Amino acid sequence: MPTEFMMGSCNGAPYVTCMRNEAVIHAPGDFLDMMAWGGEHDTNRILLREEHFAPSFYDLKTGFAGEVLQKLSNYGCRLAIAGSFSTVRSERFRELMREANKGRQIRFTHTEQDAVDWLTSS
């Protein structure tokens, strides 16, 4: 078991999260590993904090965020990311956040509790 991943649960709904306080998702493959680990533990829900992603995730020119969104769609997973997002300067990424929050696969929230609530509702 990768030591940075752990299971959480709210209202009987399990999710994968990360116990470290630093970037652990440096490339789309790292995110795929986390999704696979969740699948091994019978959940398609993932809770991360802003700092769990490398800065390149927040730069749309890298394609990193797009690949993560595509993996969520392909594998039917849900992702909640909690953080202040104060270091995100890209207006395009902020637009992506607003649009993503209208859907059901990814949610950007300001608090971890809001992320858990969204992730574990239906």
Language-model-detected regions and their locations in the chain:
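Amphipathic, Lys/Arg-enriched alpha-helical "gate/interface" segment within cytosolic domains
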Residues: 2-122
